[in-house]
From Swiss-Prot:
Keywords: Lipid transport, Secreted, Signal, Transport, VLDL. Belongs to the apolipoprotein C1 family. One of its GO terms (biological process) is lipid transport. This is Apolipoprotein C-I. PANTHER family: APOLIPOPROTEIN C-I. It comes from Neomonachus schauinslandi (Hawaiian monk seal). InterPro entries: ApoC-1_sf, ApoC-I. Inhibitor of lipoprotein binding to the low density lipoprotein (LDL) receptor, LDL receptor-related protein, and very low density lipoprotein (VLDL) receptor. Associates with high density lipoproteins (HDL) and the triacylglycerol-rich lipoproteins in the plasma and makes up about 10% of the protein of the VLDL and 2% of that of HDL. Appears to interfere directly with fatty acid uptake and is also the major plasma inhibitor of cholesteryl ester transfer protein (CETP). Binds free fatty acids and reduces their intracellular esterification. It is found in: Secreted. GO terms for cellular component: high-density lipoprotein particle; very-low-density lipoprotein particle. Residues 1-26 form the signal peptide. Transmembrane segments: none annotated. It comes from the Eukaryota. One of its GO terms (molecular function) is fatty acid binding.
Length: 88
């Protein structure tokens, strides 16, 4: 039974090996790849900067920071009052 299963798998693997790499999978030259690295890094940095600025701007324009700050200050004051009454 194992032989019946392994033979077709072996045939498929050998066919893939004999076919070779597809044209899109061919390895590009190392010098051209290394030459494009600075451009890719700059593009990545610009994209990251734009996304970070957009996120920060949306946070600044929303009222979430003010609500969060108010909630923390109210909660802190409540805890402080409870501790003051508990230890007085």
């Amino acid at each position: 039974m194992r032989l019946f299963l392994s033979l077709p798998v072996l045939v498929v693997v050998l066919a893939m090996v004999w076919e070779g790499p597809a044209p899109t999978q061919a390895a590009p030259e190392i010098s051209s790849t290394l030459g494009r690295i600075p451009d890719k890094l700059k593009e990545f940095g610009n994209t990251l900067e734009d996304k970070a600025r957009a996120a920060i701007d949306s946070i600044k324009q929303s009222d979430i920071p003010a609500k969060t700050r108010n909630w923390f200050s109210e909660t802190f004051n409540k805890v402080k009052e409870q501790l003051k009454t508990a230890f007085s």
